[in-house]
Amino acid sequence: LFGQNATGGAINVISKMPSTSEFYTKASLTIGDYSLKKASTTTNFPISDTVATKFSISTIERDGFTENLVNGQDLDDASNISIRSDWVFNLSESSSLRVFGQFFDVDRNGAAMKGIDDFTSTNERKLSQDTLSKQQITSKVFAAIYESDLGYANLKILASTQEDDVLVDRDNDRHNYQDQIVQSIPQLPYIYTPPYYPMAEFRPETSLVETTTFEINLVSNEPALGGKLDWTVGAFFMEHEIENHIRGYVDNDQNGVIRYECSEAFADPSYCYEHDYGIPGRFDVYSVSYTHLRAHETS
């Protein structure tokens, strides 16, 4: 199933279909450094001469390769699980229906991104950041593929739906408060004296992506025009919805502590959002919405 459910484009990996011929189970276990534990198993069940199913599960647990020296958190770690159920129905000698569902879940500390002026350690796998990192991903895929040999051509119909839910907490300035002085970005507004990186974080940044696709293809079995023309006729439909939210915080009080709530009456934007950091109007929508909420709550 290409398109939405394929990774890459130049290289596509297609899983082996369930088989009605035999029962079999495969399993593997890998143990390595950084407390790596990787396990997977696949079992094929022939239900009848025309129906078969295959169930697969895999898990990976591994400590991170990188250490945050400020809070001791491991980064570049791994903690995920993948589950897949695959069914095939041989409707006739010339037609089949394949239905599968897949669930994938990630719950880890996240990827390491060292700040450009982070010189607290010469080891590239050691960094200093003052925000705890988190990454959570949940992906669900459901799809069906119908194939039929019509003699003169092969008919293929594909339908699928996919939902990806992503949540990330991260240190947005990539540095630890008052540890690193701005050297590499002279255009950065100096909020502190001396010019330290502003304490900033995303907590959280979320993305919900929902995609539905439908595809139909008719591919010739025999070339036309005396064997000179192979032809394909098809149509493709996709509906794609993305909902992103970013809750960003900056230490505007310059005291090394980020405030997660504005205590000023009616959340006056001139008090809570004094700086726009070079992007005029950056907080306009957020401040108006928050002002309305605070006014309603205190009335």
Give the role of each language-model region.
Residues 291-298:
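Conserved small/polar residues in nucleotide/adenosyl-binding loops
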Residues 1-68, 73-83, 95, 140, ...:
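Outer-membrane beta-barrel translocator/receptor signature
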Residues 23-26, 66-71, 123-130, 195-202, ...:
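Extracytoplasmic loops and strand-loop junctions of Gram-negative outer membrane beta-barrel proteins
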Residues 13-20, 39, 58-63, 116-122, ...:
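Short amphipathic alpha-helical segments, especially helix-boundary/capping motifs
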Residues 50, 72, 76-232, 238-241:
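Outer-membrane beta-barrel domain signature, strongest for Gram-negative TonB-dependent receptors
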